Amino acid sequence: MIDFFRSAIAAALASAQLNTAKPIQLEQPADKKFGDFSTNIAMLAAKECGKKPRDLAQEIINHLAFPPDTVAKIEIAGAGFINFYLTPRFIMRSVEQVLRDGEKFGQSTEGNGKKAIVEYVSANPTGPLTIGRGRGGVVGDCIANLLATQGYEVTREYYFNDAGRQMQILGASVRFRYLELCGNTIEFPEDHYQGDYIRDIAATLYEQHGNALEKSEELEPFKKAAEELIFKSIKATLERLNIRHDSFFNEHKLYLANNNSPSANTAVIQSLSSSNFIDDYDGATWFLTTKLGQEKDKVLIKSTGEPSYRLPDIAYHVNKFQRGFDLMVNVFGADHIDEYPDVLEALKILGYDTTKVHVAINQFVTTTVNGQTVKMSTRKGNADLLDDLIADVGADATRLFFITRSKDSHLNFDVELAKRQSKENPVFYLQYAHARICSLLRLAKQEVGFDADTYGFADVLQVLDGAAEVQLGFALLNFPAMIQSSLRLLEPQKMVEYLHALAEHFHRFYQESPILKAEPEVRTARLLLSVATRQVLRNGFTILGISAPEAM
């Protein structure tokens, strides 16, 4: 709908021979007394067009052309806002588009021919997934779903490192537990991985090999077994949460030279050095970020010879550019806040278009269980595990609760609320709206022979003009714009808020508008409005990755 009015305003400007490069922005005023839509284009373009804002607004209005029964009135407000008030007939006629498009309603071709990559979860295989990683997984999965609705060819990638110091500690942790099973008394190091999963991996090795590995000083068999079993566990956990990946990228690839070419990490150092942004001092290799106005330079290679996180991250992004992606989205935890700006600066120096790179930082999660907050730690036996949460509250509640708050905000996950069967529970409230519509349609088929799958809808909805009906219809039409807004902000929470408001509109409509007992013409229109609402709820649930139950 927004595109319809944007095109009409652009046509009015052209008809009035008013040329402007300013974008035509349309917003929905919070207060309906200012209209259904409002634009500030007259204020933005006034100077460029050589006119006062209110005079330009009037000239635009004079050249606007709409089909009959589209706009009830147009007003100029304040310094030059143009406010549009739509007719109920236009709104309800537009709802027919929902019924025509079905599951494709809200989709666009904006991303057709473009490749996007979304990197999310990306936990190293050192232990089961924690709840914090789960939040990033859901945020990333929803962003990938949003991109897919806009026509992008989306690659969902998991980036990991199986060669770092933590993996060595993992191997040693398993070896110590294995030696205990062989009858040895071991003083287990405090800084090693302590969870029960380490004992489980050691037990698996003992079942397979008995005491055969007892004398081995090599960590590799222990590390390899741990990596394989933990990755299997991680993938199973993600599958329970309806999260999938198309590609798993091993950081180790960035360390490998190929056909007389340097490794990706070395190539980054060489390129930054040729641009005079590398120096060696204090035994380390530094990225000279002080030349970019920062207080300190940043280490790329430590004095031990190990790279810092920044170097492979830069090389990894170079690899993404080399793979031809038009859009790159990285879903990071809050621990990356200080790092990623340096990665972007390095990419700029290397000549890459960093406007293609978008970063979504999601804050930490704590869970409240029986009034007690449990902290997460992969290395502790009391780790707050994602699997445990899914088993306790279910996949739908887990997914939705992760995105009920902005990704930028710390999330307190109320486990008791997530299990509550009441309207205070957002997942129950949304799914109940869908189930309620399904129940209504089943009853309509039994009592009046209405079949939502076969009923024609042309020019039927226009008989509806009640306040609750029109508000619901208008809310339905906002779905495509909400997809675009959620994607632009990389904020799935906006979609949750929209769907919650839509459910509220439906419940109000259901209470205020008799359906099955209405006159046949009105009854049919109200049933079709319910069908359209069910469709938009389903489409939204698909983006959020939750189920759409037909009965509750």
UniProtKB/Swiss-Prot annotation:
Catalytic activity annotation: tRNA(Arg) + L-arginine + ATP = L-arginyl-tRNA(Arg) + AMP + diphosphate
Domain of life: Bacteria
Uppermost EC category: ligase
Pfam families for the chain: Arg_tRNA_synt_N, DALR_1, tRNA-synt_1d
Record-listed E.C. numbers: 6.1.1.19
A GO CC annotation given for this chain: cytoplasm
Cell compartments where the protein resides: Cytoplasm
InterPro entries, A to Z: Arg-tRNA-ligase, Arg-tRNA-synth_N, Arg-tRNA-synth_N_sf, ArgRS_core, DALR_anticod-bd, Rossmann-like_a/b/a_fold, tRNAsynth_Ia_anticodon-bd
UniProt short sequence motif 'HIGH' region, positions renumbered to this chain: 123-133
Family recorded in the similarity comment: Belongs to the class-I aminoacyl-tRNA synthetase family.
Protein name: Arginine--tRNA ligase
Gene source species: Chlorobium chlorochromatii (strain CaD3)
Underlying gene: argS
